[in-house]
Swiss-Prot record:
InterPro entries: Nucleoporin
Protein name in the entry: POM121-like protein 2
Region (Disordered): 1-67, 281-302, 328-359, 406-431, 676-726, 953-972
One Pfam family linked to the record: POM121
Bias (Low complexity) ranges: 413-431, 697-706
Disulfide cross-links: none
Biased composition (Basic residues): 40-57
Membership in a protein family: Belongs to the POM121 family.
Record field: compositional bias (Polar residues): 287-302, 339-352, 677-696
Gene source species: Mus musculus (Mouse)
């Protein structure tokens, strides 16, 4: 309509008028104006813009059933021009103009879509009248009070009383005797319905506090059913007469029987409430898995009372399978303690099980010894985050104690005390009893609240480690104590542990703090270890350990080593490293295959513990002058190494392992975990019998400023390494008259030559991928010569570049050459020409002859060495699958006669300059100057020590026959 406002005096016509005019006078109709005029007129003359959704005018003859008649209004307003030439008809330009006009008009004048459906909105309904007039409410409330609202408490109650239906409902008995009314929905008990109490009604609002009891008692059958089922579900085959908890809730209120019975229960629980604290505030003497503590009563009869503990959800699922007497209120002496004395434990260990009072905070424990203390909680205040570490599930629903006792009958297996598992048949040693076994001269250095601990191999049913049936560590009586000044501690803290591995990897974050008595002379004083848990998620309180008795074994060592004597840790299912340490004083080694391991691998390799003295794994600058196996370190952390370095043939003296400086050197390694094992056996030598183990092996992966002190004795014994790989046994013979010291030290370590053991680097389970060019190991022999390598050994990617070194220090007596075998090849009986060729086909090896030259370990590029490259390359070994690549495999050496030079082949080799990556043609890059002195076919021409380095993925079975034939050929 805005288009018609442009002319003065003209009025817009309605559509009806337009239709009438078009029918009567079609020729006199005004032509439509151009579009620009319409726009101009509308824009100029309209005072305000048109409404977008104004109501459309309904034409008078509009039919709702036929809405198409009104749709053509735009066509009526803008009809198509009549063609000028009737013969040709209308032109496309006319069509376009009319189409454009109609569209623009329809867009500017939107109209509502007419629908045949009529929606009628009714007015709001009137509010209902109140139930009673307002004047009555005012009169009842009094003139001085405000009239209460219609929804107040009093009006609602009056309305309920006045209502006949409601009054009849509450006046009738709630629980009639008729069965029809019992099945009626009105008889269902509800806590939110008003009740009659002393003739007065109570409000609708639910009241806080305890719920009201039913006024009428149900039938005796229903009461017996509910009480019997509820108690039977809690504890099977034990008759109970009380509810499982002292607190009332809606469930127990609806299922309880009567008010009189509940009163007797409450009176009964007031006496037992003292000895049953709420979960998770557990008592110190309470086992985390045993809530039905078995304790013989004074009369010897079984009493059927239940210590009604409100245990947690985990404890309800891990109830032990033992059934028997429980703590009752008739025996007041046993009240407050929950120390079980299992009959199976007494039968196995053969010790009388006396009940031990719980060790409360600030109370000195009594001097009673019992095997039944194995289920004590290791700390009085345990962080709830550590609860999952203590609840290790036992197989087939039985207790862990029964499972452990069935492992071995001759030895007492015990779990590691840092595991916090409640099942280890050990003997608690208090301060007084522990001090009684120590000479008075050594008691001054003993802490007042320390206890002897035996963190031997875990025997719990955990997926972390397997079950070990024999004691893990036995120490000679002459190598036990350490000085007081060397307060050493190990804090092996490795990488992050996943949340799903907290229970199984409880050994992965262990801080074992150790102390020892102040004595430089050898004695049988046991060491002191105080394990504490290092935080995995945040800070965790230190864990007080359970004292254990360290067994002393006097059995003579066997002359040969069997593969089954090596204890294997199976089922290494954790992805975090773990530490297993042991301190057991013993006069002699019981089993020759017992080894010491620092397990940091997930490959399930064999790990064992050697017979050695106190293992102090930690950070300390001091190194005692005693013949002990000690693990001090400068650095607080030990990084993960991607190799399995197994030191077999370790004759016990002093072992020193320092952590790496850096962990960012594992560049091409997919699995960052490894296994570092130290194995030692005590066996008689060739010429003498039962000589003491006094040789020293010092192993350090970092740097240490303190030199190693030589041990007091220099007798070396012949030893055979155990089957470290679980499949093979390698035997390396050593002349008893000669000795040398083998050590892996960092570059800046000053090491004095000490009596020795023979070192065999056993087969690695994980290969070192290519690009391992850092951490140059150096084979160092300061006594006679020094040999250095320029790059990384294929199996030893430890440390940054130029930060760690691998040195083999040996002391050469009587000018006799000994060889330390690194790799899978043994020394050859003879050599060919200018190069030492391997006897077996497909056996790559590197033999390095050490010249008489000594350099510093830090200047690795200047270190002289001689490298003999061979036909085969290390690529053939390194490119295999990971389970077949054995960069460093320990293979038994050939005969090394006593007092005779070793049959080690020498040859003049080709110098190889520069550092070579581990994935190149040679396994390790070495800076190799020329050989000082040519070595021909005679293997005995030079008396310098030689080092055979190489790898071979062959098995021992395929290798031994060929070697035996070649050896016979040499003899002929």
């Amino acid at each position: 309509m805005g288009s018609y406002l442009g002319k003065a005096g003209s009025s817009p016509r309605s559509p009806a008028q337009g239709r009438a005019d078009s029918g009567e006078k079609p020729a006199s109709r005004r032509p439509a104006r151009p579009l620009y005029q319409v726009h101009r007129v509308q824009h100029v003359h309209r005072a305000q813009p048109a409404r977008r959704h104004r109501p459309a005018r309904r034409p008078p003859n509009w039919d709702p059933a036929n809405p198409t008649a009104f749709v053509s209004e735009a066509w009526r307003r803008f009809p198509m021009k009549r063609p000028q030439n009737p013969i040709m008809g209308s032109l496309p330009s006319d069509w376009w103009e009319s189409y454009l006009k109609r569209n623009i008009w329809s867009l500017r004048h939107p109209r509502a879509t007419w629908s045949p459906v009529t929606v009628k909105i009714s007015p709001p309904e009137r509010r209902p009248r109140p139930l009673f007039p307002v004047s009555r409410v005012v009169n009842s409330a009094g003139p001085s009070e405000e009239p209460p609202g219609p929804c107040g408490k009093d009006p609602v109650l009056r309305a309920l009383l006045q209502c006949r239906k409601g009054r009849a409902r509450w006046e009738e008995p709630l629980f009639p005797d008729t069965s029809d009314s019992q099945r009626h929905s009105a008889s269902v008990w509800s806590a939110f319905k008003p009740l009659l109490k002393s003739g007065a009604t109570v409000s609708f609002v639910a009241r806080p506090g305890s719920l009201k009891r039913r006024p009428h008692v149900q039938s005796s059958d229903d009461k017996c059913k509910r009480s019997g089922c509820f108690s039977g579900a809690l504890v099977a085959s034990i008759h109970t007469q009380g509810p499982p908890s002292t607190k009332r809730n809606a469930i127990t209120s609806s299922y309880s029987s009567s008010r009189e019975l509940s009163g007797s229960w409450k009176r009964h629980f007031l006496r037992t409430l003292v000895q049953t604290p709420e979960w998770p505030l557990k008592k110190a003497g309470e086992s985390p898995n045993s809530h039905l503590s078995v304790t013989p009563s004074s009369s010897g009869q079984l009493n059927g009372e239940i210590p009604l503990l409100q245990s947690g959800p985990r404890d309800l699922l891990t109830i032990p399978c033992q059934q028997g007497p429980v703590v009752t209120e008739e025996d007041p002496t046993l009240e407050g303690q929950a120390v079980p004395s299992n009959q199976t434990t007494e039968a196995t260990t053969g010790t009388a099980g006396d009940s031990i009072p719980e060790m409360r905070a600030g109370i000195q424990p009594t001097l009673s010894l019992s095997r039944s203390s194995s289920e004590r909680v290791l700390s009085t205040h345990v962080n709830p985050q550590l609860e999952s570490l203590k609840n290790m599930p036992a197989p087939l629903g039985c207790s862990q104690l029964e499972h452990i006792q069935g492992i071995s009958s001759d030895s007492n297996p015990s779990i590691a005390s840092t595991q916090a598992s409640p099942s280890s048949p050990t003997t608690p040693v208090t301060d007084s009893t522990w001090l009684s076994s120590i000479p008075r001269a050594h008691r001054s250095a003993v802490p007042p609240h320390s206890s002897v601990i035996n963190p031997t191999a875990p025997t719990t049913q955990s997926t972390l480690v397997g079950v070990v049936s024999n004691p893990i560590l036995h120490l000679p009586a002459s190598v036990l104590p350490v000085e007081t000044s060397s307060h050493l501690a190990l804090r092996p803290i490795w990488g992050p542990v996943h949340s799903t591995e907290v229970r199984t990897a409880s050994y992965s974050r262990i801080s074992v703090m150790a102390e020892a008595s102040s004595s430089s002379s050898p004695s049988t004083t046991p060491g002191i270890l105080r394990p504490t848990f290092k935080p995995i998620f945040g800070s965790i309180e230190p864990l007080q350990t359970m004292s254990e008795t360290a067994p002393v074994h006097t059995r003579q060592p066997s002359s040969s080593l069997s593969s089954d004597s090596t204890h294997l840790f199976h089922s290494l299912a954790t992805t975090a490293p773990c530490v297993v340490t042991s301190v057991i004083p013993a006069s002699k080694s019981k089993d020759p295959g017992v080894d010491l391991n620092i397990v940091t691998s997930t490959t399930g390799n064999s790990c064992s513990v050697p017979s050695c003295s106190t293992f102090l794994l930690g950070a300390s600058q001091n190194f005692p002058s005693a013949t002990d196996l000690i693990f001090p370190s400068q650095h607080p952390t030990i990084p993960t190494v991607h190799t399995v370095t197994i030191f077999s043939q370790v004759l016990t003296s002093a072992i020193k392992i320092s952590p790496l400086r850096s962990t960012d050197t594992l560049k091409g390694v997919s699995n960052p975990l490894a296994t570092l094992g130290l194995s030692s056996t005590n066996q008689p030598p060739v010429t003498s019998s039962n000589s003491n183990v006094t040789s020293a092996l010092t192993s350090s992966l970092g740097s240490s400023p303190k030199p190693l002190l030589p041990p007091s004795q220099r007798n070396t014994s012949q030893s055979s390494p155990g089957a470290i790989d679980g499949l093979k046994q390698s035997s390396l013979q050593l002349a008893p008259a000669q000795s040398f010291s083998t050590s892996f030290l960092s570059e800046n370590s000053g090491v004095s030559p000490t009596p020795s053991a023979q070192l065999v680097l056993s087969k690695t389970t994980q290969p070192a991928c290519g690009q391992l060019t850092s951490s140059a190991p150096i084979i160092h022999t300061p006594a006679t010569s020094q040999t250095g390598f320029g790059s990384t050994l294929a199996g030893f990617p430890f440390g940054k570049a130029s930060s760690t070194a691998l040195r083999v220090i040996r002391q050469n007596h009587q000018s006799v050459t000994y060889s330390s075998v690194f790799g899978s090849t043994a020394p050859r009986p003879f050599a060919f020409g200018g190069l030492v060729m391997p006897m077996d086909c497909g056996e790559p090896e590197v033999i390095v002859a050490a010249p008489k030259r000594s350099t510093s370990g830090t200047r690795q590029s200047m270190t002289p060495s001689t490298l003999a490259p061979f036909v085969q390359c290390w690529n053939q070994s390194m490119q295999g699958p990971p389970n077949q690549i054995t960069p460093l495999a320990g293979i038994p050496a050939r005969k090394i006669m006593s007092g005779a030079p070793s049959l080690v082949p020498f040859a003049q080799s080709i110098p190889v300059p520069g550092a070579i990556k581990a994935g190149s043609s040679l396994g390790f890059g070495m800076s190799s100057p020329t050989v000082q002195g040519s070595v021909g076919r005679n293997p005995l021409r030079s008396l310098e020590p030689s080092f055979c380095i190489g790898t071979k993925s062959k098995t021992l079975r395929n290798r031994e026959p060929g070697r035996s034939r070649k050896h016979h050929t040499y003899k002929k």
